[in-house]
């Protein structure tokens, strides 16, 4: 389950970061975040073991930290849901556009930029497409039982695995094309950045943005505790041990898949990588049919995944304003307002990497790092000033500083540009 949650489209966003970090150092940073992920999840698991009964993460937090912290967590979860919906919509719209360009207009408009200027950004094309697609999303989100969309998890994993295989199999040919057409021996700027970490610390401070992106890639904590709750209820005597082993295995698997994606995406084009490898330009202006299929596949998987982020948001708002009761009027009004508002933002602001920096820097560090560790420390009923507890708080503090700095740097970049 953890692997399923982490194995999202963010896995394809790291090639551009490898150019500034250096491939080796990005892998090191990914490893560190993977270790942090395991540490903070197991802290939440240990905190949950002290609860007699729980159904979700917020109940664990209230049990150990009180109602105030549960409200804080719910606030961040609402922000997280809104941000993810906007991020996914900002990705879905251009993915469908790239699919249309690659499949039907490749001869007339060789690049997506050409297609965008000539067709895609024309109001008479873009506006109806956005309205219709968002309307279909609203219909999907009106469903009250999330279990009816369980198939979306399988579509998502299948889309990611398929795309990963395409990138892996084709990266050798793309790297060869890069060496023959872009690599210049005398020009070091065209060389692959294997180990130079310095570029990540230049004026744009890409290190902090890259780390915030990694925090988002591993943001899975709230979603796994309902699964763990059921496991604990069924296996009360060995729940914690099994949870920790499952978390370790899933973290190793997720990190290994991230490694494969980072390496193969980087080798696809070390000199001019796209924000997402699925945006890559085909060799010799060919159609790259397998990646065309991948774009459509991922766009569809994201479309069916979005309700999974919307349902908790709707429930949180209903709990806050209607006592948890979701009437038909509330359901229809809130669904259409939320979906169209998020779509409007996504149609104007479509910087995927910046969305990931904001989510990781301002939200994930709190719901995935600070709150689980605090719940664990309070569950021990020991002074927070005890040396081992203090070390954990310092580690969390460093992660929060890195994340928030990444978010602030991203804001500064947006203001400049």
Outline where the language-model segments fall.
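Alpha-helical transmembrane segments of multi-pass integral membrane proteins
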Residues: 1-4, 29-33, 212-213
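Membrane-interface recognition of transmembrane alpha-helix starts
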Residues: 1-9, 79, 394, 398
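Membrane-interface "cap" regions at the ends of multi-pass membrane proteins
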Residues: 1-16, 37-42
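Extracellular loop-to-transmembrane helix junctions
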Residues: 17-47, 54, 58
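Alpha-helical transmembrane segments and their membrane-interface exit regions
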Residues: 32, 36-40, 160, 364-371
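Membrane-interfacial loop- and helix-cap regions that link adjacent transmembrane helices
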Residues: 42, 48-74, 86-129, 153-156, ...
């Amino acid at each position: 389950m953890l692997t399923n949650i982490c194995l999202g489209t963010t896995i394809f966003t790291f090639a551009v970061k490898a150019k500034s970090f250096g491939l080796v150092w990005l892998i090191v940073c990914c490893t560190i975040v993977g270790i942090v992920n395991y540490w903070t999840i197991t802290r939440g698991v240990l905190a949950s073991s002290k609860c007699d009964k729980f159904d979700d993460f917020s109940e664990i937090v209230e049990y150990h930290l009180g109602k105030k912290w549960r409200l804080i967590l719910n606030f961040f979860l609402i922000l997280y849901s809104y941000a993810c919906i906007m991020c996914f919509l900002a990705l879905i719209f251009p993915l469908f556009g790239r699919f249309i360009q690659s499949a039907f207009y490749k001869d007339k408009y060789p690049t997506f930029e050409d297609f965008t200027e000539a067709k895609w950004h024309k109001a008479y094309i873009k506006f109806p497409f956005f309205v219709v697609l968002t309307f279909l999303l609203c219909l999907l989100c009106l469903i009250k039982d999330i279990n009816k969309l369980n198939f979306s998890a399988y579509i998502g994993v299948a889309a990611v695995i398929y795309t990963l295989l395409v990138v892996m199999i084709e990266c050798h040919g793309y790297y060869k094309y890069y060496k023959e057409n872009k690599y210049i021996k005398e020009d070091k700027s065209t060389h692959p950045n294997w180990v130079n970490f310095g570029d990540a610390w230049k004026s744009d401070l890409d290190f902090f943005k890259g780390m915030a992106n990694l925090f988002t890639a591993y943001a899975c904590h709230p979603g796994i505790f309902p699964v763990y709750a059921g496991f604990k209820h069924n296996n009360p005597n060995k729940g914690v041990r099994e949870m920790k082993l499952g978390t370790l295995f899933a973290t190793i698997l997720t990190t290994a898949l991230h490694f494969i994606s980072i390496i193969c995406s980087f080798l696809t084009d070390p000199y001019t990588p796209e924000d997402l490898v699925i945006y890559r330009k085909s060799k010799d202006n060919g159609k790259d049919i397998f990646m065309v299929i991948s774009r459509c596949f991922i766009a569809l998987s994201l479309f069916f995944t979005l309700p999974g982020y919307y349902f908790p948001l709707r429930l949180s708002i209903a709990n806050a304003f209607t006592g948890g009761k979701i009437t038909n009027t509330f359901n229809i009004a809130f669904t259409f307002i939320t979906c169209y508002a998020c779509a409007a933002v996504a149609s104007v602001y479509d910087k995927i990497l910046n969305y990931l920096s904001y989510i990781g820097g301002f939200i994930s560090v709190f719901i995935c790092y600070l709150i689980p560790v605090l719940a664990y420390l309070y569950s021990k009923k020991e002074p927070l000033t005890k040396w081992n507890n203090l070390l954990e708080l310092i580690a969390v503090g460093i992660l929060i500083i890195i994340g928030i700095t990444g978010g602030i740097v991203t804001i500064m970049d947006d203001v400049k540009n």
